[in-house]
Amino acid sequence: MLQKYFPAVADLPLFMPLRDAYILPDVPAIGNTLTEAKASYCSFNSLPPDAEERFKRFSESVASHYSGASNNWAIDGQHTFNGRPLLANDPHQPLNSPSLMWGHHMNSADQGGDLDVIGFGFVGVPSVQLGHNRYLAWAATTNFPDMMDLWDVEVSAEQVKIGDEWIPAEIRTETVKVRGEEDLIFDVLTVPGYGVLLPDDVAPIPLVFFNHRILFNWTGFGPTHEAVGFHGFDMSESLDDFEYYVDLMEIAAFNFVGATTDGISYRSSPLVPDRGMPSDDQPHYRMLDGGDPGTIWTGNYLQSFQLPRCRGGDRGWIVTANNDPFGFTSDGLLDGDPYYYGVYFDPGTRASRIESELTRMINAGPVTIEQMQTLQDDTYTLMADDLIPLLESAYAAVYTDDALAEYRDRDDFDSLVELMTNWDRHMEGDSSAAVVFNAFCFFATREAVGDDFGIIFETVLSYEPVYMIKFAIQVLTDRISNAAEYLPDGKNLTILRALDKTVAYLNTQFGGVDPSGYIWGEIHGTRFDHVWADGEGIGWVATDGAAGTVNVSSSNFFRYGVPLARLDATSGAIHRMVTRFDEDGIPVSQVNFTPGNGGDSFSPYFENTLDDWVENHYQQLLFDDEDIQGNTVESLELRRDITEQ
C-alpha cells in the first residue's frame, strides 16, 4: 500500500530504530544512518474519493487491538546485592476492568503432585503464564519475528495462481456461536498448503487489481504446543528445563527470560520461514508477487542457531523491550543481513534507557531490588534528547536568519524554550514541562512528515505514536542523508512552526503558556474500559509516563487533526514484578498489578490494587504456605460430590 499510494513514505527507513539497543550481547552499533531515502512525493490522485473517511473508520476499528509494549530484564548474581540473580517484568496489555490477567497460586506439590507455582495468567487459560515456581522465575515480552507473508495473486474462477501453477482453492465454512443470537457464518477461501485469501475489504483502500486477491500465510495455521510449553514452565526446575519448553513453542513469539539461583537465560524459538538471502529488491515485509516462485515458502524454517538465545554473555545481564534481537535493522537495509528474521521492532527507546540505567547501576555497585523497582517506574523520555537540542538551535537562529523573522520578540517562545531547556525530561504527573513537550513533539511530528503520510498520518499515529514520532526524528536529526528533501522549508522553520502551534494549543486549552496553569497529571491518564460494552468500567485515573518511556503510557494527541482535551492511555503494565532468590534458591517476588483480582464489580477486590499500581508501590507475592495462611481473609473450598459417581 505504501509504495503504491504513498511512495515518499515507502522510501523512508521504516524499520531503522532510534537507538542502537539490541537484545543479544556484543551486537556492534552500525550507526543509525541510512545513505539515502527517496523522497518521491505523491499527489494521492489514485486514492478513492472517500479514502479519508475510510481511514477514519479503519483507525477506529484497529484501535482496540493494540496492546502496548513490555519490558523485562535479568541481572546475573555477579552484579546483585545478594550474589543471586534478579529478574524484572512488566508485560503490557489492554487495561480493562475486570483485568485480562489474574494472579493465582496452584499447589498440588504439598499433596504429592507436581505443581507449586504462582504468578499471573490470562483469565480462562490454564497454567500460570508469567511467574515463578520453587526453582524458576520467568518473564516475557513480545518479539516481532516475521512469521507471515502477503502475496498479490491472480485468481480465476476457483483457482489461484501460485508461481507458474494454478492451484484449486477450497471453501471452508466457519460457524461462530453467539449467545442469544443467530450463528455467524463465514466462508473462508483456502489455498491448501499456501494460506487463505483475505476478504476484499480487509484494507480501507484497494491493494490489488481486478481479478487479484491477497493471499495470507502464517506459520500458526495448524496445531501448536504453546499450552504444553507454558505448563512446562510451571514445573521446570532448571534453566535447561526452561529452555526445553521454550523450544516446544511454535508461535509464541515472545522474548522469554528465565532465572534460577544458578543463572539467567534469554530464549525465543518461533517458527520463522527461511526465505533465503534477504534483499531490498524483494522485501518480505511488503506484499509479494504471488507469480514469482522465488517468493513462495519452501517449508524450511530458521534453525536454532539462527534464533535468539543467550545466558547473559560476559556482561552478565539481559534486556528485552520488544526491540531487535540481532541488530539487523540498524542500517535500515536488508542487503548484507545473513538471513531475514523480521523488521518491525520497537524503536529502541525503552531498551536503550534500561540498558544505560543498568550499566550505571552495575558500575556504581551491587544492584538492589529497590533500584529494579525504580527503573520499572522510569518516565525519562529519550525523544526529548533528540528534539529539545533542535529547538534550542532553531530558536538561537531567530535573530540571525531572516527566514525566521516572524518569530522574533516572542515572550511566549522565550518562556517555553526556557521551560523545556531546564526540564528534567521525566513525564511525571506534576510536570508542566511534560505537557509542553508532549504537544511540541506531536506538532513537530506532523510538521515534519504529516504531508508525506497524508491521510494515513493519523491512522498510524493513533495505533502507536512512537513509530510516527520515530520517522519525524529520523528526518529532523538527519539520520537519512537527504533529510532536507522532506523539509522543503528547512529544519529550523519546521521546528519553530511546531512551537508556534504549541503556543496556540496552550492558549486554547489553558488560557496561556504560563506553566502554573497545567500539569501532566491533569490531562494525561489511563482509561479502564469495561470488557463488555454496556459494563461500568473504573474510568480514568491520572498516570505517569508517555509513549516511549520505560513506564509506558502511550496516548494519542490528535483526533481528526484537532488536539484532544484529555489524553487517554488504554494499555500499560498489567503487572510489575521483581524477583530475587533467597538463600535456599526459592524465588521471592515483589509485585503490583491493576486493577484488582476480582472479576465482579461489586467485589472488594475488583479495584483494590489500583492505587498501588498507580503509585508503583510493591507488596510481596506470598508463596510460602505459612505466610499465605497467616494473611488469608477469605477462602472457598470446592469438593467433588462422590455420591453422584
Range-by-range predicted roles:
Residues M1-S46, T260-Q645:
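Long, compositionally biased non-active-site segments enriched in small/hydrophobic residues and glycine
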Residues A63-A69, Q78-P85, N89-L100, I205-H225, ...:
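Active-site-adjacent "gating/activation" loops or surface patches in catalytic cores
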Residues N72, D76, P85, H92, ...:
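Short, well-ordered alpha-helical packing segments
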